[in-house]
Amino acid sequence: MSWELLLWLLALCALILPLVQLLRFLRADADLTLLWAEWQGRRPEWELTDMVVWVTGASSGIGEELAFQLSKLGVSLVLSARRAQELERVKRRCLENGNLKEKDILVLPLDLTDTSSHEAATKAVLQEFGKIDILVNNGGRSQRSLVLETNLDVFKELINLNYIGTVSLTKCVLPHMIERKQGKIVTVNSIAGIASVSLSSGYCASKHALRGFFNALHSELGQYPGITFCNVYPGPVQSDIVKNAFTEEVTKSMRNNIDQSYKMPTSRCVRLMLISMANDLKEVWISDHPVLLGAYIWQYMPTWAAWLNCKLGKERIQNFKNNLDPDLPYKFLKAKKD
């Protein structure tokens, strides 16, 4: 082979590879590392069997679907949230798979804001199953209100629930994992923990706090390579998170039903989460475009992202004031993409 031909082939590859990556990105519903793991990585069916998994926020949405898909893998489940009746419903749904028995699922009601109860809850799990292999920090609430109209108590509640509660439970479970020198801490964050948006200032703050905390904690536990961390950043997913979101008062939530057809199906989000857990990925972004693209812009071009955020934010706020879905701009952009 002549040098001229070799150089020509190298130049052709240099042109084709970026084009292939661009096409992959345009079709992506997660970051490319996660999608590569989905294609070539380890399967959850191989890696996550025979484990004890504790899921908070398990009464609906991502937490419920995660419990359901984990039940198919034959794990022992601990289901926690405040609503005991809903947890029992989720338990029945998991048992319908036929892979688990009553003794394999522990319903453990838990209020993340009641940090004094976390130590006893952890002991209850260890007494029931003898170990905790995976803690999934999924509990939390969102927010839909303007900063100047929002009572300070709402911001306190968001920090106490989304951040302090998660930190507290993690601190209770970690000594057990350190003693065993193994375990997984999975934290369901949000794209809002990367790219801040209007009407969710307190929620964004709590999610940014989680990102900083778990990145720092990971570095502190470097001497325990068997303890791994996975921070999951979903975009819009079909769930009740907006319906249950705080508004300007702690006692008020959105409670209005909105169109969720443009959001990612919960089952797809959870499947990608399981793949990230099976492959020990440290940080994963799970979202359709244009939100996924927005996360990349925030990461690599923050000045431009801030300008774009202000432009879209005006429309979000106007829709909110008109009692419309604030996310209509993203819905429109996704419809154009589809």
UniProtKB/Swiss-Prot annotation:
<feature type="active site" description="Proton acceptor">
    <location>
        <position position="203"/>
    </location>
</feature>
<keyword id="KW-0732">Signal</keyword>
<feature type="binding site">
    <location>
        <position position="239"/>
    </location>
    <ligand>
        <name>NAD(+)</name>
    </ligand>
</feature>
<dbReference type="InterPro" id="IPR002347">
    <property type="entry name" value="SDR_fam"/>
</dbReference>
<keyword id="KW-0472">Membrane</keyword>
<comment type="function">
    <text>NADPH-dependent oxidoreductase which catalyzes the reduction of a variety of compounds bearing carbonyl groups including steroids, retinoids and xenobiotics. Catalyzes the reduction/inactivation of 5alpha-dihydrotestosterone to 3alpha-androstanediol, with a possible role in the modulation of androgen receptor function. Involved in the reduction of all-trans-retinal to all-trans-retinol. Converts cortisone to 20beta-dihydrocortisone in vitro, although the physiological relevance of this activity is questionable.</text>
</comment>
<dbReference type="GO" id="GO:0016616">
    <property type="term" value="F:oxidoreductase activity, acting on the CH-OH group of donors, NAD or NADP as acceptor"/>
</dbReference>
<feature type="binding site">
    <location>
        <position position="203"/>
    </location>
    <ligand>
        <name>NAD(+)</name>
    </ligand>
</feature>
<feature type="binding site">
    <location>
        <position position="207"/>
    </location>
    <ligand>
        <name>NAD(+)</name>
    </ligand>
</feature>
<keyword id="KW-0256">Endoplasmic reticulum</keyword>
<dbReference type="GO" id="GO:0004090">
    <property type="term" value="F:carbonyl reductase (NADPH) activity"/>
</dbReference>
<feature type="binding site">
    <location>
        <position position="62"/>
    </location>
    <ligand>
        <name>NAD(+)</name>
    </ligand>
</feature>
<feature type="signal peptide">
    <location>
        <begin position="1"/>
        <end position="28"/>
    </location>
</feature>
<protein>
    <recommendedName>
        <fullName>Dehydrogenase/reductase SDR family member 7</fullName>
        <ecNumber>1.1.1.-</ecNumber>
    </recommendedName>
</protein>
<dbReference type="InterPro" id="IPR036291">
    <property type="entry name" value="NAD(P)-bd_dom_sf"/>
</dbReference>
<dbReference type="GO" id="GO:0052650">
    <property type="term" value="F:all-trans-retinol dehydrogenase (NADP+) activity"/>
</dbReference>
<dbReference type="Pfam" id="PF00106">
    <property type="entry name" value="adh_short"/>
</dbReference>
<keyword id="KW-0520">NAD</keyword>
<dbReference type="InterPro" id="IPR020904">
    <property type="entry name" value="Sc_DH/Rdtase_CS"/>
</dbReference>
<keyword id="KW-0560">Oxidoreductase</keyword>
<feature type="binding site">
    <location>
        <position position="190"/>
    </location>
    <ligand>
        <name>substrate</name>
    </ligand>
</feature>
<comment type="similarity">
    <text>Belongs to the short-chain dehydrogenases/reductases (SDR) family.</text>
</comment>
<keyword id="KW-0521">NADP</keyword>
<feature type="binding site">
    <location>
        <position position="60"/>
    </location>
    <ligand>
        <name>NAD(+)</name>
    </ligand>
</feature>
<dbReference type="InterPro" id="IPR053011">
    <property type="entry name" value="SDR_family_member_7"/>
</dbReference>
<dbReference type="GO" id="GO:0005789">
    <property type="term" value="C:endoplasmic reticulum membrane"/>
</dbReference>
